[in-house]
Amino acid sequence: MAGALENARKEIKRLSLDDTNESQYGQIYSVSGPVVIAENMIGCAMYELVKVGHDNLVGEVIRINGDKATIQVYEETAGVTVGDPVLRTGKPLSVELGPGLMETIYDGIQRPLKAIKDESQSIYIPRGIDVPALSRTVQYDFTPGQLKVGDHITGGDIFGSIYENSLLDDHKILLPPRARGTITSIAEAGSYNVEEPVLEVEFDGKKHKYSMMHTWPVRVPRPVAEKLTADHPLLTGQRVLDSLFPCVQGGTTCIPGAFGCGKTVISQSLSKFSNSDVIIYVGCFTKGTQVMMADGADKSIESIEVGDKVMGKDGMPREVVGLPRGYDDMYKVRQLSSTRRNAKSEGLMDFTVSADHKLILKTKQDVKIATRKIGGNTYTGVTFYVLEKTKTGIELVKAKTKVFGHHIHGQNGAEEKAATFAAGIDSKEYIDWIIEARDYVQVDEIVKTSTTQMINPVHFESGKLGNWLHEHKQNKSLAPQLGYLLGTWAGIGNVKSSAFTMNSKDDVKLATRIMNYSSKLGMTCSSTESGELNVAENEEEFFNNLGAEKDEAGDFTFDEFTDAMDELTINVHGAAASKKNNLLWNALKSLGFRAKSTDIVKSIPQHIAVDDIVVRESLIAGLVDAAGNVETKSNGSIEAVVRTSFRHVARGLVKIAHSLGIESSINIKDTHIDAAGVRQEFACIVNLTGAPLAGVLSKCALARNQTPVVKFTRDPVLFNFDLIKSAKENYYGITLAEETDHQFLLSNMALVHNCGERGNEMAEVLMEFPELFTEISGRKEPIMKRTTLVANTSNMPVAAREASIYTGITLAEYFRDQGKNVSMIADSSSRWAEALREISGRLGEMPADQGFPAYLGAKLASFYERAGKATALGSPDRVGSVSIVAAVSPAGGDFSDPVTTSTLGITQVFWGLDKKLAQRKHFPSINTSVSYSKYTNVLNKYYDSNYPEFPQLRDKIREILSNAEELEQVVQLVGKSALSDSDKITLDVATLIKEDFLQQNGYSSYDAFCPIWKTFDMMRAFISYYDEAQKAIANGAQWSKLAESTSDVKHAVSSAKFFEPSRGQKEGEKEFGDLLTTISERFAEASE
């Protein structure tokens, strides 16, 4: 009966499959960790992609038996139950191939980790999340190829290209391998995302549209036109590998070694320095934002290039090493007044940033003690700010309150405890923190009221005004005096001449200062009352006209009241009252104080903000004397107020004030009729406050404005701000060198954080990898620009690790089809084999050695056979290669491990790592006695045409090392003195080779990367030293004496590694040629 019911149930289900939607579903029959068996799966195919359970977990069919299918699930299966639906997709597990692969970090099934983090706001990958591998929002500039409408096109043909980054500037757009037809339309040059159709072809009367991306099943090798024999070395920059155990572009390499032997170091070296075009390894601002460069000039962020230097907060340059670009939500930073109600500085501090831009913030600690009633009880509470991490891993400042109940401690006790707790809070005045713009919305409003950004003072001094004086045959040291005159002119100068008009009787000392400084600069002055006179006469007669008396010190005393002082105009001329060669007028015109567009506009140019500090202070002092007044507030602080009718003068003044660390703001008064019916003209009122203002006022001429010089520090000026989300735009960022503080100044002196840094969603290794750099054509570039990382996070199930190796090799084949030389680094294939073992165990398959499946060797071979050099499908002709470098981590460094032995049977190069060498800090820790390469003969053609002696030198070095190993065993028995001189030379030269040739310092500029030409020249030097020594011994010399007399030669050979490759091959060949000559000559002299 039970059997009949079961058959009936199956029949009912079978009949219901007539519904097309229902036919897509099966049901879970059993669950065992990542292995799920589903029933009612008739029609599914091997390696078909399925969605398991109500969470749509990604899985892949790996076995079919009747209507049951065994599925390996790539996500955690907790909570999945029998009877849950299984959705068939009808497609194999595939990856997306197209623009956007570079600089991206994926998990084992090509899910972008950063995009998942942004969507889920979690450092973990939520179950069932579905994020496209390639961004659908980023726009790429598509350039069509030579194909046009009507041309026939077939799989692999290139029909366009895009600029991805500065290292991959010709990402070719390919037609998928299985597509073909006649072109009916092709997109014009322009910006498109990866989904928009850019090509339409017709075949057999059917039209198909293609975008810049396509998909490809990971377990199927991409087809090629022809497999070629690899004949070019894969240069790693490591001497021991490039000389003794070379690999080819398109070869297979195995790196077995125990933990701590340096497998990852070699992997990073490959990524940084290898001659591959692409490596597959398993914040920013809106356009137009002005950045302050290291020389004080402003430059649009989109115009900045790698290698440029921007201004750091300490006035020192910061080198640009990367240029992140993208398309994202943007946020406008808008300055507010201290009350946070309205814009404060006329948009001077406004700028726009991308969502992942890091804001550098300061929150003023505000500890308050108050008594309050909560739920009928009285408490004494302490309110304060604290920096803490949220559940999603974001660090932000929060307002906290700690309460002490009166009903528990009594009133006095609660108040005492509150006071003690308040005293124990961190006493720093400000909390410094950094947060991404997109996360600022999570900050509480109460915290925002106390949170500010920083306007950093400019410590750099360009000396531009002094240099300008020098060019005009004046003393550089007079730059502050000229600065004062320029500031005074900006306040009360005539817009059409170098004349100053003073309206107050109090401005006599200002007039004196103008005449005095003009005299020092070789100019003369005249006034409206006294005609053109030289400076000394002018000053004397000027005061005589006032009825002044002169004392012995040369100072004047006169009656305060005089009608003559209602208005005084001083004209400044060139030497001898000439209208030509007027230094002040030339300065006003050429330095930008008079706007070029019209004669009636004054301005203070931007470059003054980076001039010498004394020049900046003198210029503001002149402006305060001319058009300002100084007030002492009730709290004892001093404020200077400057009034001007020129907007550009006000903006320039604020910028210079900010550059000195002086707080400033602009209050705009539009033209209006006041309460008394008087017309008031347009005016900009600039308020200046802060301790550094004392440096300015000490340079004023008028007594009412002067203050004594006091000690002060130039701290950043804080400004309140609001963050407003705006539309998506293209963003432009810059990445600064790793050793810097990652902070630089915008043109408005806002202190900002560089872009391109990775978040905390990766493991430590993945944090380090994006921060590595390589040098390309003299430019320092992040290696992520030519790298795609396929990473398996620690919390990903075992099945995803099994798939990751196929994901990586498929991405590598895609770039090979573009004509690139690709290195795929599998680190480590042992983890992949362990994943294979676990799944095999759950499937109940017969285990082989150490529990690994019997088909381990076949699986490894099917992976490695996808390496090689090949002619790609399609036109134009392209030759590319995929090199596989697999790190293996055998337990305890045992090379008889099944994974190691299976890998060695397939790969052609074996770089064996030695734990003892690693413990001695000998890196790369390659054991030369067990390592080998089967590519040496294949590469002879390359060596013959480039370095003819290379094979002989390599064989000689290996022979010396091999003989020395045998001799070391003899020395342990009989001692070194029992050896012949010839054998002693072999031992000494072998030691020299090990310490100065095989060993490399990865942290030095001279040795981190060794080009093949330097490796070759060093090999010649070492072998020449060996040959000359053996020749001298054969002629009767004693090695002990000879070694002593030629110790300088040995030192020179040992120091050959210190030659900087950046000096170039020609210089290197000359230096090594001189070394070879020296070796021959010194041994010849010593032998005589």
Curated annotation (Swiss-Prot):
SUPFAM superfamilies found in the cross-reference section: C-terminal domain of alpha and beta subunits of F1 ATP synthase, Hedgehog/intein (Hint) domain, Homing endonucleases, N-terminal domain of alpha and beta subunits of F1 ATP synthase, P-loop containing nucleoside triphosphate hydrolases
One annotated GO molecular function: endonuclease activity
EC numbers for this chain: 7.1.2.2, 3.1.-.-
GO cellular component, one term: vacuolar proton-transporting V-type ATPase, V1 domain
Domain DOD-type homing endonuclease: 485-662
Membrane topology: Peripheral membrane protein
Record has Lipid metabolism as a keyword: no
PTM per Swiss-Prot/TrEMBL: This protein undergoes a protein self splicing that involves a post-translational excision of the VDE intervening region (intein) followed by peptide ligation.
One Pfam family per UniProt: ATP-synt_VA_C
Keywords: ATP-binding, Autocatalytic cleavage, DNA-binding, Endonuclease, Hydrogen ion transport, Hydrolase, Intron homing, Ion transport, Membrane, Nuclease, Nucleotide-binding, Protein splicing, Translocase, Transport, Vacuole
Any one of the GO BP annotations: ATP metabolic process
InterPro entries, per database record: ATP-synt_VA_C, ATP-synth_a_Xtn, ATP_synth_asu-like_sf, ATPase_a/bsu_AS, ATPase_F1/V1/A1_a/bsu_N, ATPase_F1/V1/A1_a/bsu_N_sf, ATPase_F1/V1/A1_a/bsu_nucl-bd, ATPase_F1/V1_b/a_C
Domain of life: Eukaryota
Reaction catalysed by this enzyme: ATP + H2O + 4 H(+)(in) = ADP + phosphate + 5 H(+)(out)
Similarity comment: Belongs to the ATPase alpha/beta chains family.
Self-association state and partner proteins as the record states: V-ATPase is a heteromultimeric enzyme composed of a peripheral catalytic V1 complex (components A to H) attached to an integral membrane V0 proton pore complex (components: a, c, c', c'', d, e, f and VOA1).
Known function: Catalytic subunit of the V1 complex of vacuolar(H+)-ATPase (V-ATPase), a multisubunit enzyme composed of a peripheral complex (V1) that hydrolyzes ATP and a membrane integral complex (V0) that translocates protons. V-ATPase is responsible for acidifying and maintaining the pH of intracellular compartments.
Protein name according to UniProt: V-type proton ATPase catalytic subunit A
Organism of derivation: Candida tropicalis (Yeast)
